[in-house]
Amino acid sequence: MTKKDIRVVNIVVSSSLGQDIPLEKMAATLSNTEYNPEQFPGLVIRIKEPKTSALIFNSGKIVCTGARDLDEVQRSIKQIIKSLEKINIKITIEPKVTIQNIVASGAVGMDLNLNVLAMKLQNTEYEPEQFPGLVYKINVEPKGEKVLKATFLLFSNGKVVCTGTKSEHQVHQALDALIENLKKVK
């Protein structure tokens, strides 16, 4: 019997600070930043607590990664705003956060024969010489909701990584669908 076990390990969000940000000034003043505009137009800011990183662009757009829940996301955005206040940039809006991707890891509670799954499941990629996991793209059609697309990495020991969802609820819907599909293969 399968035992469902999964937890969120990373949330990627986007947001906007609602104004242009002087990245050169941030990079020159704040020690927890990296900025090399010849290589990439965004500034990287690393936040110690919660342990997250964000890309900040001149336009004020932000992409934040590393948070494990929405509370950590909000705390990270607040830390960025505090950092900006240190260089006399006042953010007057409450930034609206949009989840772009959630990564979750866990286990299905049983060993998996990846060779069999690669042959019997649709939308799989399995190249054991290059990577020990099987990539499985799944479409879930919850009643009354739009189609949910998720991608799983499946490992022979039953461990899984799920990506492509936008809520914890979707993670669980995708995992339930995965387990149903795995049961059909046996």
What are these regions (language model features)?
Residues M1-K159, T165-K186:
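Intrinsically disordered, low-complexity polar/charged tails and linkers
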